[in-house]
UniProtKB/Swiss-Prot annotation:
Designated name of the protein: Nucleoprotein
Function (record text): Encapsidates the negative strand viral RNA, protecting it from nucleases. The encapsidated genomic RNA is termed the ribonucleoprotein (RNP) and serves as template for transcription and replication. The RNP needs to be localized in the host nucleus to start an infectious cycle, but is too large to diffuse through the nuclear pore complex. NP comprises at least 2 nuclear localization signals that are responsible for the active RNP import into the nucleus through cellular importin alpha/beta pathway.
GO biological process: symbiont entry into host cell; viral penetration into host nucleus
Family membership: Belongs to the influenza viruses nucleoprotein family.
Residue positions of motif Bipartite nuclear localization signal: 198-216
Length: 498
């Protein structure tokens, strides 16, 4: 990993800050969180939501989505230029759930985007507060990562669905800035690049003219982001080749899928941050907590602390298991969709089960679902320990991984061996090492084959008691390595549909 001197910390990305010391970073992240909280309180007042309704995660998602839509300049412009029937480009809305006579009712609300922007700016001292918007995008992205498996998207771009551990942030919008780029997995970046290359192959004018120049700049920028995620010289050199290609085509496509596979063993560094729903920040602000004064970090104890003291509710469909719904949201809150289940279970203090064993669908309720039998329950989002979130991929140890997911991407900085199935991964590397990247390919394959267990275990700190806020005494858990560790194992998760 490059030294901290050359990379801004995530919190600086998160708050667009220039170099700041730790205290300033904590304050600016706190300011961002406080702004989201104040906005949420104001929206609950506008909508006349009861305390319980305001703590309902479905209402939180609707309100978050409204403000993101209100600030989506590109889409707003597009909607105004291409008016579609029954869609007012100046309005935004969604379902709000209220408790009426002992039953949950759905009400569709509609607001002027201008009005939403005004409320947001007012909550953020008159600023656009883009960092806060990005923070909400990352929370939605983490929720999608825990809820859906991107099989179709992987297959469409010629990758193997078992590589899902590389797909963090695959549903993040393009406008999510540096903070968004930091949390995108290697597979996500590869997929974005492959989509561009495919368009270039099908559309002769894609790289030409004034528009093509902009496209080219975007392409090179994405290549550099991906290059920065790799930790070995050979992988980076291959990215230089892909970036410098005169006319990106099949050779680049091959190189990129090769690199994506190699990342299952020689892992990229992908940031993880705990982004919580607005309905957690709102009540905390309402209770008088001053995030800016106290300071806040997305990668330390703070989110765990906040969740220990928060009450969040969720609608539950008739045949869903509330404990499973809680697990889904807990994983989303800590960006742990691709973490080893043994590590997550240890930290959470209750067993975290694979996606295929969860009796719960996504958190959002579709507009055609019947509200009659809808219940609600408390989400259990507390944890037994806390751990620092990591931005490094760690390295891997030869351990069995599962049929549905052949590698993991660590979230918590906890020392362990990492599961992945070397034979499965290496089987993908038969054949093609010719062409202009042959020496790099050979070098990468050699590194993968010779990776020794100790090179490739994850050297992390350990977990901490919730009373140990200074992270003074790490507990290094021991894991039963005979067990299954991946979340999307033998999976039947729903597909993500935009």
């Amino acid at each position: 990993m490059a030294s901290q001197g050359t990379k801004r910390s995530y919190e600086q990305m998160e708050t667009d800050g220039e170099r700041q010391n730790a205290t300033e970073i904590r304050a600016s992240v706190g300011k961002m969180i406080g702004g989201i909280g104040r906005f949420y309180i104001q929206m609950c007042t506008e909508l006349k939501l009861s305390d319980y309704e305001g703590r309902l995660i479905q209402n939180s998602l609707t309100i978050e989505r409204m403000v993101l839509s209100a600030f989506d300049e590109r889409r707003n412009k597009y909607l105004e230029e291409h008016p579609s029937a029954g869609k007012d480009p100046k309005k935004t809305g969604g379902p709000i759930y209220r408790r009426v006579n002992g039953k949950w009712m759905r009400e569709l609300i509609l607001y002027d985007k201008e009005e939403i922007r005004r409320i947001w700016r007012q909550a953020n001292n008159g600023d656009d507060a883009t960092a806060g918007l990005t923070h909400m995008m990352i929370w939605h992205s983490n929720l999608n990562d825990a809820t859906y498996q991107r099989t179709r998207a992987l297959v469409r771009t010629g990758m193997d669905p078992r590589m899902c551990s590389l797909m963090q942030g695959s549903t993040l919008p393009r406008r999510s800035g540096a903070a968004g780029a930091a949390v995108k997995g290697v597979g996500t970046m590869v997929m974005e690049l492959i989509r561009m290359i495919k368009r270039g192959i099908n559309d002769r004018n894609f790289w030409r003219g004034e528009n093509g120049r902009k496209t080219r700049i975007a392409y090179e920028r994405m290549c550099n982001i991906l290059k920065g995620k790799f930790q070995t010289a050979a992988q980076r050199a291959m990215m230089d080749q892909v970036r410098e290609s005169r006319n990106p085509g099949n050779a680049e496509f091959e190189d990129l899928t090769f690199l994506a596979r190699s990342a299952l063993i020689l892992r990229g560094s992908v940031a993880h941050k705990s982004c919580l729903p607005a309905c957690v920040y709102g009540p905390a602000v309402a209770s008088g907590y001053d995030f800016e004064r106290e300071g806040y970090s997305l990668v330390g104890i703070d989110p765990f602390r906040l969740l220990q003291n928060s009450q969040v509710y969720s609608l539950i469909r008739p045949n869903e298991n509330p404990a499973h719904k809680s697990q889904l949201v807990w994983m989303a809150c800590h960006s742990a969709a691709f973490e080893d289940l043994r590590v997550s279970s240890f930290i959470r203090g209750t067993k975290v089960v694979p996606r295929g064993k969860l009796s719960t669908r996504g958190v959002q309720i579709a507009s055609n679902e019947n509200m009659e039998a809808m219940e609600s329950s408390t989400l259990e989002l507390r944890s037994k320990y806390w751990a620092i979130r990591t931005r490094s991929g760690g390295n891997t140890n030869q351990q069995r991984a599962s049929a549905g997911q052949i590698s993991i991407q660590p979230t918590f900085s906890v020392q362990r061996n990492l599961p992945f199935d070397r034979t499965t991964v290496m089987a993908a590397f038969t054949g093609n090492t010719e062409g202009r990247t042959s020496d790099m390919r050979t070098e990468i394959i050699r590194m993968m084959e010779s990776a020794r267990p100790e090179d490739v275990s994850f050297q992390g700190r350990g977990v901490f008691e919730l009373s140990d806020e200074k992270a003074a005494s790490p507990i290094v858990p021991s894991f039963d390595m005979s067990n299954e560790g991946s979340y999307f194992f033998g999976d039947n998760a729903e597909e993500y549909d935009n």
